[in-house]
């Protein structure tokens, strides 16, 4: 994990290069990626902190999909402004800070026709206990709530670092919120999808905290 973490940090230097080039990423599930354009309706993109996770949102915006991303500011007071600058300039200009105000911002973006991307693998103290690998884990239910309230499809996205500075990004089959009874049931489905991502690529999951802390 730490090797991948270090490589991801170094790669912030090359975000401009990644923004302007195409041959470093292979995209699978392009049909799913383009659902917001084909259906002229926002979606919720969900993923976890794998490989260089920043490239997922970058590739979405490179397809001219209107996107806003929800992020957690870094604890480092000095480094955080630089990271925010780089994200807005090269990844996605619409950055939403995690929190109550961020939820309101996400809703406003959705009403304007923007898709929303967020990570679901971090512990959220105000979240619900949703099972992850058989153990209850405080988990955000925001993607489920937004999907149910606004009838938005959820698109799982995963990324894997390959050899020679190459990446593979997979946009998986959409999830219809109408197939679930409530936010808990839908959130459990999302955690199961996250489990499969982790099982497939455990060494590239950036996991630096106690995910199951209560």
Task: Give the ranges of each region predicted by the language model.
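Short acidic/polar alpha-helix capping motifs at helix-coil junctions
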Residues: 20-23, 47-49, 68-71, 106-110, ...
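Non-catalytic C-terminal accessory region of glycerolipid acyltransferases
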Residues: 34-39, 62, 100-214
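Membrane-anchoring hydrophobic helices of lipid-metabolizing enzymes
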Residues: 1-47, 82
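Alpha-helical membrane-targeting segments
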Residues: 6-10, 78-79, 112, 149
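Catalytic core of membrane glycerolipid acyltransferases/transacylases, capturing the structured
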Residues: 4-7, 39-99, 125-130, 135-136
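General small-molecule cofactor/ligand-binding pocket signal
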Residues: 26-28, 96, 172
